[in-house]
Amino acid sequence: ATNPLKVLNIHTRIIEQPKAQLADCLATLSKPNDNLWPSEQWPAMRFKKGIEVGAKGGHGPIRYTVEEYDPSKCIQFRFTNPKGFDGIHKLELKEITNNKTQITHTIAMKTSGKATFNWIFAIRALHNALIEDGFDKLENKFSKDTKRSEWNWWVKLLRKQLAKKVAKI
């Protein structure tokens, strides 16, 4: 057996908007009018009954349960799948000034077994691209200019391979 890999993956973005505006956007997470999750390019985040403490859902093969829900501050999820992901991911809002808010996405987990390999060689790169796309979507909601983070070659290759795999199903 391999030793668990400790993962701390943090993305932050400063958005030139009051915290209340971003809290309103965070409250749309997984809803049809979602202002944050980039479901235009990635598997949608889905929860049958919406996001509330105890709700089960996820995106693609990644599954989690809502542990904390206060869209004015934090939404925290605990991983339930894939096997070997032991930990949480969360979105947090922090007021910097009256018109400037920091949004942070954090994964804090330990991986074990096959999940360690999958995190290192595939999921991490896809996750990083997805979160930056989500932050772009949020920022673009309030901007005249369109921000679009560029995917690196590895993300493009992984997405191409996954698209082929899905097409065969």
Question: Can you describe what each PLM-predicted range is?
Answer:
Residues 50-58, 76-82:
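Short beta-strand segments that buttress and anchor functional surface loops
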Residues 42-46, 64-68, 94:
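Short, exposed beta-strand/loop patches in secreted or surface proteins that constitute
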Residues 81-140, 149-151, 155:
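Beta-strand/loop substructures that line and gate deep hydrophobic ligand-binding cavities in soluble
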